[in-house]
């Protein structure tokens, strides 16, 4: 979904929980507390059915949130939602501060280096450490994984749908080694 979409992808329904229709929603960002702040979500099932759903109750756990959704009354109802993508309404969220971005707005941006050379497109965001990592892919190129920090991502232009990347040295060293036929240890 684009930056102008009324929704931001939050995560997915990981599994049914219990017998009374609860579902476990796993956020793409494990540290996200967004679900605690909204009363409704937008759900897109694997079959492509989309609908708004109201949250009736939420119980956080270390890996996911256990949620009661309006109209989901049984385990069968809950199992029908497993694998569904979960979105939040942009209008229900506080706008990001100056220089900050919703992670979902970064996915789909074209990535270029400081000289404007195409590196690929931001396809995913991995949140495995203190800062998220942008996963940049392009046909015929190795995948780039770049920390989303000012040092490596000096410019984000949502209007132009473009992000400027300064890859970490180890990535550049690996690319030089690959171009010369050797591995990173052969790079200067």
From Swiss-Prot:
Signal peptide segment: none
Function, in words: An accessory protein needed during the final step in the assembly of 30S ribosomal subunit, possibly for assembly of the head region. Essential for efficient processing of 16S rRNA. May be needed both before and after RbfA during the maturation of 16S rRNA. It has affinity for free ribosomal 30S subunits but not for 70S ribosomes.
Protein family according to the UniProt entry: Belongs to the RimM family.
Species, as recorded: Myxococcus xanthus (strain DK1622)
Keyword entries, A-Z: Chaperone, Cytoplasm, Ribosome biogenesis, rRNA processing
Protein name stated in the entry: Ribosome maturation factor RimM
Cellular component terms per the entry's GO annotation: cytoplasm; ribosome
Subunit structure as annotated in this protein's UniProt entry: Binds ribosomal protein uS19.
Free-text comment on this protein's domains from its UniProt entry: The PRC barrel domain binds ribosomal protein uS19.
Gene Ontology process terms (BP): ribosomal small subunit biogenesis; rRNA processing
Gene (UniProt): rimM
């Amino acid at each position: 979904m684009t930056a102008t979409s009324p929704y931001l992808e939050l995560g997915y329904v990981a599994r049914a929980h219990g017998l009374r229709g609860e579902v476990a929603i796993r956020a793409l960002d494990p540290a996200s507390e967004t679900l605690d702040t909204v009363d409704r979500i937008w759900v897109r099932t694997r079959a492509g059915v989309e609908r708004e759903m109201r949250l009736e109750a939420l119980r956080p756990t270390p890996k996911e949130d256990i949620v009661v959704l309006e109209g989901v009354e049984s385990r069968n109802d809950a199992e029908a939602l497993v694998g569904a993508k979960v979105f939040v309404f942009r209008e229900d969220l506080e706008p990001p501060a100056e220089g900050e971005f919703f992670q979902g707005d970064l996915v789909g941006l074209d990535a270029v280096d400081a000289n404007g050379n195409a590196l690929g497109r931001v396809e995913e965001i991995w949140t495995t450490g203190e800062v998220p990592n942008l996963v940049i892919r392009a046909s015929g190129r190795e995948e780039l994984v770049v920390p989303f920090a000012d040092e490596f991502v000096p410019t984000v232009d949502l209007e132009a749908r473009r992000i400027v990347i300064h890859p970490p040295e180890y990535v550049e060293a690996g690319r030089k080694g690959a171009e010369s036929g050797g591995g990173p240890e052969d790079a200067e």
